[in-house]
Design a protein with these regions (language model features):
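Active-site beta->alpha N-cap acidic-glycine motif
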Residues: 7, 16-17, 21-96
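C-terminal domain-boundary segment and adjacent tail
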Residues: 68-70, 222-307
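Short catalytic/ligand-binding loop motif for oxyanion handling, primarily in non-cytosolic enzymes
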Residues: 39-41, 84-86, 108-111, 147-151, ...
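The substrate-binding groove and active-site-proximal loops of carbohydrate-active enzymes
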Residues: 47-54, 78-79, 106-118, 138, ...
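Conserved, mostly hydrophobic/aromatic
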Residues: 34, 67, 103, 140, ...
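Active-site-adjacent pocket scaffolds in enzyme catalytic domains
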Residues: 131, 135-244
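Metal-dependent polysaccharide deacetylase catalytic core of the NodB/CE4 family, i.e.
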Residues: 70-151, 160-161, 165-166, 194-205
Length: 307
């Protein structure tokens, strides 16, 4: 590994350029999927949920069909350890024209891994996914957005061209505000350094509090009428938007949650799953009506002249 200083600069990202669209109108929308099993949830660490035999990834085809109906291409980030057993799904994702990236080897938090361990495991995960999918992958997303700067620099050394792990959400104990010193902000949510791109997960700042309106449990929790209001506020301030979802949120297949999990944690895992796919379709259509063009992160890079 080369010294990380090669990619580090004391300057902060530059101020965002003027928006290309009128307030209330959207430019680009990036729909992303963390391709993992339900037992990868950080809430379930320490339990032996994997042994239940219940899997949600085989239900992903309803989601893929919905994307086809809406004419939307998305970016998937796959956990390496499940790639081989889901090779058919990965190849179908690629066949339908979606982008595929890496979501780590085992979904453990990067803050719990040394740089050396991260490099070794990421190299292995990349090879697993590429073998299963039959194509090269160039994108990365850290589990629970726990990317750190030295590991971000390492992804470039490992052959990745873009990452999507940055989120501004200080109120969440897991998330980190990723250091992007030396990057320039190309436009809303998009940061570039040389030929490497970082895509941010948006939050909405209201009265000093960051509201994560872009996906995950918050997409499940918020009713659509509230999401519509929050997205309307967001659209007046920003022109690009990133959504992130997980396969277990796109199906209502019963999950055998372990005893002793706790009511609050069980609520976080289960709230809003039923009907969430329909709600996501509504969000997609809302963004389209405001001019948003859905595009994969790979295609976005190509349009910027990056490879």
């Amino acid at each position: 590994m080369q010294d990380q200083d090669k990619y580090t600069n004391a300057s902060a990202p530059q101020a965002i350029p003027p928006r290309a669209t009128a307030p209330g109108r959207m430019n680009r929308a990036y729909l992303t999927v963390d391709l993992e099993e339900w037992y990868h949830l950080d809430y379930l660490k320490g339990f032996r949920c994997r042994e239940s035999g219940v899997r949600v990834l085989p239900q992903i085809f309803d989601f893929l069909d919905m994307l086809d109906e809406e004419g939307v291409k998305v970016t998937f980030f796959c956990v390496g350890e499940i790639a081989d057993e889901n090779a058919g799904i990965l190849r179908e994702i690629v066949r339908r024209g979606h982008a595929l990236g890496c979501h780590g080897l085992d979904h453990e938090l990067l803050t719990n891994k040394s740089l050396e361990q991260f490099v070794d495991e990421t190299r292995r995960a990349k090879a697993m996914i590429e073998r299963a999918a039959g194509r090269e992958i160039t994108g990365y997303r850290a589990s629970c957005f726990t990317m750190e700067r030295d590991k971000l620099d390492a992804t470039r050394q490992l052959g990745f061209a873009y990452d999507s792990s940055k989120i501004r959400f200080a109120q969440h104990p897991l998330y980190r505000n990723l250091d992007l010193s030396g990057f320039e902000q190309a436009e809303d949510l998009v940061y570039v350094k040389d030929d490497f791109t970082e895509y941010e997960i948006p939050t909405l700042d209201i009265m000093g509090y960051s509201i994560p309106i872009s996906g995950g449990g918050y997409l499940r929790l918020f009713p659509f009428w509230l999401l519509r209001i929050l997205l309307g506020i967001y659209a007046r301030r920003h022109e690009n938007f990133t959504i992130y979802v997980h396969p277990f949120e796109l199906t209502d297949v019963p999950l055998p949650l372990p005893k002793g999990l706790g009511k609050a944690t069980a609520f976080r895992c289960l709230v809003g799953r039923r009907g969430n796919l329909k709600k996501l379709r509504k969000v997609i259509r809302w963004l389209k009506k405001r001019g948003a063009r859905f595009i994969t992160l790979e295609a976005d890079r190509r349009e910027r002249g990056l490879r």
